[in-house]
């Protein structure tokens, strides 16, 4: 290395793609996560980076803290064997704090802080200000098995809290609707889609076939209802790629729900459309009753519930106001006059235009009809 030259890169010349050293103080993610090609997201609005790792069975989130000191600077040395040049690139040291994704979603309706939320606050305080002994105790509690991260225990605790809340609200909560906020004046907050679809289900929805249709890499199958083709055509004009993916996932959930209702109690039609067994079990848990590991039953009341959910998701896709519901109704083999009752059920104002055209708009605060409807 007698002819070694050193090139020091100034931080202002790095642009947006600045290198970063990630410090996993709670232990490195399991190799099984890394092999799944985890996604790195650089947050432009906040001085932080996120690393999200997802699999079918475990969901972990790493949120970083900037540990740089004003008294010390760090850099990465990159040596080029061909030119014998050593580049010195300034970098930041980011400590990645680990937590379970989605464990507070089912507790949004409660004003009382949950045990999981309290534990998470304590853990963050311990990581930031705790002594070495405190940090070791916290790590021992949570990191004895880094591949599980007590995810199963956390889920059971959440289910227990959810059941307690359900018992309290059972006399008031309609069984044919998801959880809702009847007090808000913002229509976007009445039905929380993120609470309806837990992260493990949302990320498990196979939206790729719809993305392929939008990008013209494949054609829409002939059996796909016109409503879905029209929505995908509309998505082509959306510039935000994340919004397109989000909408495709909601549309995928609607498609799976329709198939569930029409597939006569068998899993095969859903599996053919790329639906995982975990998503199938979730659909059956909210829309039907399980007979065995391959069969389920959908009652007439279950169908009414599916129609209500489809109305809510359709409203979400079109900013809570739909000019004409005819296409969606036809995809369910219903008339507009028949399907409009389900928009009324979820709290919409319906405007009738002629014999078949129906325009609907969700109104806030929510006012539900006193009686349910049947088709």
From Swiss-Prot:
The keyword Nucleus applies. One of its GO terms (biological process) is transcription by RNA polymerase I. The keyword Nucleus applies. It is found in: Nucleus, Nucleolus. One of its GO terms (cellular component) is RNA polymerase I complex. One of its GO terms (molecular function) is DNA binding. It holds the Pfam family RNA_pol_I_A49. It comes from the Eukaryota. Keywords: DNA-directed RNA polymerase, Nucleus, Transcription. Belongs to the eukaryotic RPA49/POLR1E RNA polymerase subunit family. Component of the RNA polymerase I (Pol I) complex consisting of at least 13 subunits. DNA-dependent RNA polymerase catalyzes the transcription of DNA into RNA using the four ribonucleoside triphosphates as substrates. This is DNA-directed RNA polymerase I subunit rpa49. It comes from Dictyostelium discoideum (Social amoeba). The gene is polr1e.
């Amino acid at each position: 290395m007698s002819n070694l030259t050193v090139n020091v890169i100034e931080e202002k010349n790095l642009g947006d793609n600045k290198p970063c050293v990630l410090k996993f103080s709670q232990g490195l993610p399991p190799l099984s996560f890394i092999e799944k090609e985890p996604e790195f997201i650089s947050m432009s609005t906040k001085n932080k980076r996120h690393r999200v790792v997802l699999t079918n069975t475990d969901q972990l989130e790493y949120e970083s803290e900037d540990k740089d000191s004003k008294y010390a600077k760090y850099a990465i040395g990159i040596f080029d064997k061909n030119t014998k040049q050593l580049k010195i690139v300034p970098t930041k040291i980011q400590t990645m704090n680990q937590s379970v994704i989605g464990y507070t979603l089912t507790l949004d309706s409660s004003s009382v802080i949950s045990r999981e939320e309290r534990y998470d606050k304590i853990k963050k305080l311990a990581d930031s200000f705790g002594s070495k002994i405190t940090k070791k105790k916290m790590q021992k509690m949570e990191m004895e098995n880094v591949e599980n991260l007590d995810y199963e225990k956390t889920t059971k605790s959440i289910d227990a809290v959810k059941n307690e809340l359900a018992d309290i609200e059972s006399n008031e909560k309609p069984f044919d609707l998801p959880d809702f906020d009847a007090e808000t004046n913002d229509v976007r907050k009445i039905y929380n889609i993120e609470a309806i679809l837990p992260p493990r289900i949302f990320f498990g929805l196979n939206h790729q076939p719809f993305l392929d249709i939008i990008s013209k890499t494949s054609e829409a199958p002939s059996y796909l209802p016109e409503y879905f083709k029209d929505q995908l055509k509309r998505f082509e004009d959306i510039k935000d790629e994340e919004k397109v993916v989000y909408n495709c996932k909601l549309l995928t959930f609607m498609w799976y729900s329709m198939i569930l209702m029409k597939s006569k109690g068998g899993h095969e039609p859903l599996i053919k459309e790329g639906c995982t067994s975990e998503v199938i079990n979730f659909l059956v848990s909210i829309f039907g009753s399980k007979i065995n590991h391959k069969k389920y039953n959908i009652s007439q009341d279950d169908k009414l519930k599916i129609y209500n959910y489809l109305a809510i998701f359709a409203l979400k896709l079109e900013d809570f106001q739909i000019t004409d519901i005819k296409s969606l109704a036809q995809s369910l083999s219903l008339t507009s006059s028949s399907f409009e009752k389900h928009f009324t059920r979820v709290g919409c104002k319906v405007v009738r235009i002629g014999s078949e055209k129906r325009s609907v708009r969700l109104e806030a605060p929510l006012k539900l009809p006193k009686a349910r409807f049947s088709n």
